[in-house]
Regions:
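A glycine-rich phosphate-binding loop feature that marks nucleotide/adenosyl-phosphate handling sites
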Residues: 179-186, 323-327, 381-386, 405-412, ...
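Accessory alpha-helical DNA-binding modules that contact the DNA backbone or grooves
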Residues: 32-33, 44, 48-115, 120-146, ...
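Long, charge-rich intrinsically disordered scaffolds of nucleic-acid metabolism proteins
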Residues: 98, 403, 409, 414-484, ...
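C-terminal accessory/binding modules appended to enzymatic or scaffolding proteins
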Residues: 15, 313-315, 478-512, 630-674
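Low-complexity, acidic/Ser/Thr- and charged residue-rich accessory regions of DNA metabolism proteins
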Residues: 143-144, 148-152, 208-209, 246-256, ...
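Long, charged amphipathic helices and adjacent flexible linkers at domain junctions
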Residues: 285-303, 454-487, 595-640
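Duplex nucleic acid-engaging cores and interfaces of nucleic-acid transaction enzymes
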Residues: 51-54, 61, 65-322, 328-414, ...
């Protein structure tokens, strides 16, 4: 990668050039973000996953920019306009807008007024006016009157059209205006279409104005969505006269002030250039740039929410009875073994209109006893509270815990190809209930099968740049899977596909080998898997676990490339490697500095020692049960001042949504989080966090609930 890009990335991320250079080199060698951040700390100077991912993002951006530069240079060269100075300007670009501004005058374009004027032979007149090379434009214009130009006025008008287009394509003019526009206010007005119920959700923006520099991402995205739907007209409030004067002043500073007759013509050309060409173009540019920033923030929030969702506490390998609640169609019940395999399914009808409560109680009691059920998972959708109350009437064995589980995305999963492949003989209701039960056992292993956009934890996710969103979500899923580690002998191909260096094809091959040859007994056995070579092994091995392996390091995050270091540590302590692994007292006696070498630095040695103390540790917390307020069943039961327990279901830039046990979630606005001013919700709350809230408003007409966070 060129040094200008290396330096640009380093400046953007506030890191050293060599850190960027080494990261890029590792990427080019096939290394992944999790592998680099975990096992190559010496090469990166200890950059964390976020920083490494940012380097990857920007290296990809600049790789695309380099391709664009080649296209631009070829196009300008073919037009016979490429000079050495122009080539240097293009080569030195590190901003795509700057590159496009430079290319604009040479870009193929549709027929314009300026094109017609040039065809009429008026470009020499425009050149003389533009270069302030004449005093009397009228006298000069007379020379151009003829077959193609009917009058002096037509000649001057054509020359002004050429000048206006030239100004609109001048990079310095565009950048000057861009900086002015960025400091102004974005203003909206309701359109004639904004009369129906669909438009009312944008009512607060029907006559709205806010500084473009300060507008919150969610407000900008809402405004732009309303504009796309035809309910708002959007513009940037700028003073056209001042903008025209500014670019005219800059123009004259570079040349000289024209005499009065020419000045009048130039003012007309500048005014036309601004109003007809520059203002709409620069407005679009600046709003697009503001949206890009809003996209980045929204995608960041989505990624953070997804991380918290994927790393939600698991109950682990327990026998689960899962219920997908319903009224008319009944509650679908499934029983799962410790590995999540389906043992039994049937429907019960404890709620109206059937109301077979006694029979349903007997069924649940029988299933709990027959299958040795340890935990019960209840979906949080329709009839969830009623089903939870019903389960409390069942006399369960001591120790059986009851959990409410988010159903977000379960219906998407149940109708997916993945679900059909897993359960071809069962319908969507059974698949949905199985998904609810498995999410309780291991949220990460189950949720990787579902498109993250279906999980209900985003902010205007359908409005943001989809490629940016996909990149962030893929990185987040990969990060979570690799931070937890994956059991090589139980993981599905969907989970394995997110392990560093594997992907869908190798994941299928790993599962196929396991099916044909039985459980893996060592990490080295991976090298027998079809198409899994040395590079893939290097990237994935440290993130895969083999419980009960002959070598205990195979069930840890210690990479096979470092096994010899652990063996030496054990030998120096006079014990075996098996005796060392997991023995905190022995690990505390290791002198880390003794094992530092040219290839392995102190950061890696410290990581190894920490892993030896708690091999294969799961970074996730333990699952805990939770109960909503029993007296609240609908929004009509709420009143201002009530204090209620709740669970955070979504976090946005403007607040957090909380499930308080009824159909509608409440909103803790950023101003209601117990801190002075507007809080950053993502720094105060976590997804699925259990909270105490006070009701501050209830709007029955719009079914909206306002909440305040209590300490």
């Amino acid at each position: 990668m060129k040094s200008i890009y290396i330096k640009s990335i380093a400046q953007r991320l506030q890191i050293k050039d060599w850190q960027v250079e080494n990261c890029v080199s590792l990427f080019e060698d096939g290394a992944t973000i999790p592998f680099i951040s975990r096992y190559r700390k010496e090469r990166t100077g200890g950059l964390d996953e976020v920083a490494v991912a940012e380097v990857k993002h920007w290296s990809d951006v600049f790789a695309e920019m380099e391709k664009r530069k080649v296209t631009v240079l070829e196009a300008i060269d073919q037009a016979g306009a490429l000079t050495e100075e122009l080539r240097k300007r293009i080569d030195s670009c590190v901003e795509i807008r700057e590159l496009e501004d430079i290319y604009l005058p040479y870009k193929p374009k549709r027929r314009t007024r300026a094109t017609a004027a040039k065809e009429a032979g008026l470009e020499p007149l425009a050149d003389k006016m533009y270069n302030v090379a004449i005093v009397d434009p009228v006298a000069e214009a007379r020379k151009f009157v003829g077959d193609k130009v009917a009058s002096v006025d037509d000649a001057l008008a054509g020359a002004r059209d050429i000048i206006a287009e030239r100004l609109s394509e001048t990079a310095s003019v565009r950048e000057t205006l861009r900086q002015i526009f960025k400091t102004r206010r974005i203003a909206t007005k309701a359109t004639k279409k904004a009369t129906g119920q669909e438009a009312m959700k944008y009512k607060s923006y029907f006559d709205y104005s806010e500084s473009l520099e300060r507008i919150a991402p969610h407000r900008l995205l809402a405004i732009l969505r309303a504009e796309d739907e035809g309910f708002l007209s959007v513009k940037i409030d700028v003073d056209a006269e001042k903008c025209g004067k500014k670019i005219y002043y800059d123009f004259c500073q570079e040349r000289r002030y024209p005499a009065a007759p020419l000045a009048e013509q130039m003012h007309m050309a500048f005014d036309d250039a601004f109003k007809r060409l520059l203002e709409p173009s620069i407005s679009n540019d600046v709003i697009k740039e503001a949206k890009e920033k809003a996209d980045i923030e929204s995608v960041r929030i989505f990624g953070e929410n997804l991380r918290q969702l994927l790393l939600a506490p698991p109950v682990g390998q327990k026998r689960v009875l899962a219920i997908d609640p319903g009224f008319r169609t009944g509650c679908k019940v499934v029983c799962l073994d410790e590995q999540g395999n389906l043992l039994h399914n049937e429907a019960i009808f404890p709620h109206p209109p059937v109301s077979e409560k006694v029979k349903a109680i007997q069924t649940i009691s029988s299933l709990v006893s027959k299958y040795g059920i340890e935990v019960i998972a209840i979906g949080n959708g329709t009839a969830s509270r009623e089903t939870e109350d019903f389960i409390k009437r069942v006399q369960l064995p001591e120790g059986v815990r009851v959990f409410t589980v988010s159903e977000d995305g379960a219906s998407i999963y149940s109708a997916s190809d993945v679900a059909r492949e897993e359960f071809p003989e069962y319908d969507v209701t059974v698949r949905g209930a199985v998904s609810i039960g498995r999410r309780l056992m291991d949220p990460l292993a189950e949720l990787v099968k579902i498109d993250p956009k279906s999980l209900g934890v985003g902010q205007y996710q359908h409005d943001v740049d989809l490629s940016l969103l996909k990149e962030k979500l893929d990185n987040t899923v990969e990060s979570c899977v690799n931070s937890v580690g994956v059991n090589l002998n139980t993981a599905s191909s969907y989970l394995l596909s997110y392990v560093s260096g594997i992907g869908p094809a190798l994941a299928d091959n790993i599962v196929e080998y396991r099916s044909e040859n039985g459980a893996y007994t060592s990490r080295k056995e991976l090298l027998k898997v079809k198409r899994l070579g040395g590079k893939a092994f290097e990237q994935c091995a440290g993130f895969l676990r083999i419980a009960g392996a002959d070598n205990p390091l195979d069930n840890s995050a210690v990479h096979p490339e470092s096994y010899h270091i652990v063996d030496k540590m054990a030998k120096d302590l006079g014990v075996t490697t098996k005796e060392l692994v997991g023995n905190v007292d022995l690990c505390s006696k290791i002198e880390a500095s003794r094992y530092v070498s040219g290839d392995v630095g102190l950061p890696t040695i410290n990581d190894i020692i920490n892993e030896l103390k708690k091999p294969g540790r799961d970074p996730r917390e333990s699952a805990e049960t939770f109960e909503f307020c029993h007296d609240i069943k609908t929004i009509e039961d709420l009143s201002v001042g009530m204090e209620l327990p709740g669970i955070v279901t979504n976090i946005t830039a403007f607040g957090a949504f909380v499930d308080i046990g009824i159909k509608q979630n409440g909103l803790i606005h950023a101003s209601q989080m117990g801190v002075k001013g507007m809080a950053d919700p993502s720094k105060i709350l976590k997804l699925h966090q259990k909270v105490k809230v006070t009701v501050v408003s209830v709007d029955l007409d719009r079914a909206r609930i306002g909440l305040r966070l209590e300490k």
